[in-house]
Amino acid sequence: MSRTRLVAIIGQRMAPARREKTLSGTMAYESAADETVFIIGPFLVGILASAIAPWVAVAGASVLTFVFVTAFALHPTGKLVVGQHAELTQAPARQLLRPRLVVVVVGVLGIGLFFGSTLTSLTAFMETHGEASQAGLLYGLMGIGSAGLALGSAAFPRAFGLGWRWLVFGVVLLGGAIAFASADSVVAAGVILAIMGIGIGPTLVAQYSLGSDRSPVGRSATTMTILGSAVIVGQSIASAIAGDVAEQHGTAAAMLLPAVSAAIVVVAAVGNLLLPRRVATA
């Protein structure tokens, strides 16, 4: 919802000459915020569970959700886009299935799969080392480089295009995931997680920026919702699969799944570069 609102405001109220730079910075911030949710969140949960009790983390999340979601709903920016384009023609819904948009959704889904498979396999790995409650703390190491590079993505030169950023940092993610599968100590796993974090932030920024650029006319809200849901759905599916694999086939097998997820991200990035270019519709 946040991305949808911000993209609409930028598209409706920013001068065309400033839109690209502003959108890039906005997507960088939003992706860094995602890192806080998907990576730093488990890190904080681990701290609270270890220092106080597990229920404290759940209670804290409930309070934060109530306070800040309510504040977002009532924020004055919500009125800036209401009724502004009531007569704007919407592109047919079938345009959401265009290959150049679908490939972005697949890439974002891959990131969600990576989040879920990494945290679940890491938890199994830490359990074999007798430190299952510390998995969230170790997982948080990915957020260091990820959030920082996500915010710094706005400073990348225009010559380093979004499609190439996706591919380059996706390869970094894949390389780290392959190394993660062979980690044999907690220290090694921590170092590898930090390296993998370097690939996540810029990849998400590139994907969301491409999704915004390729959104059909009048369908930006739907596009942003699909992309956001792809992360969550991917994380949920991968968590369930990785948990079952860990129980049925062992931790080593589960630790291969992040590499599979990262491979999906890279394959989608290659597909994105190979697809014929078209003029952005939104």
Description of each model-found segment:
Residues A49, G148-L162, A246:
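Helix-to-loop junctions at the C-terminal end of transmembrane segments
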Residues T65-T77, A259-A282:
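Multi-pass alpha-helical transporter architecture, strongest
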Residues M1-M14, L122, P202-S215:
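Intracellular juxtamembrane helix-capping segments at the cytosolic ends
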Residues A73, V172-D184:
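C-terminal ends and interior cores of transmembrane alpha-helices
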Residues R94-G140:
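Helix-loop boundary and gating motifs at the non-cytosolic
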Residues G218-H249:
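A late C-terminal transmembrane helix in Major Facilitator Superfamily
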Residues M14-S31, A132-G136, V217-L227:
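Loop-to-transmembrane helix entry/capping segments in MFS-fold secondary transporters
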Residues S50-V63, S133, I241-A263:
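A membrane-interface helix-boundary motif in multi-pass transporters
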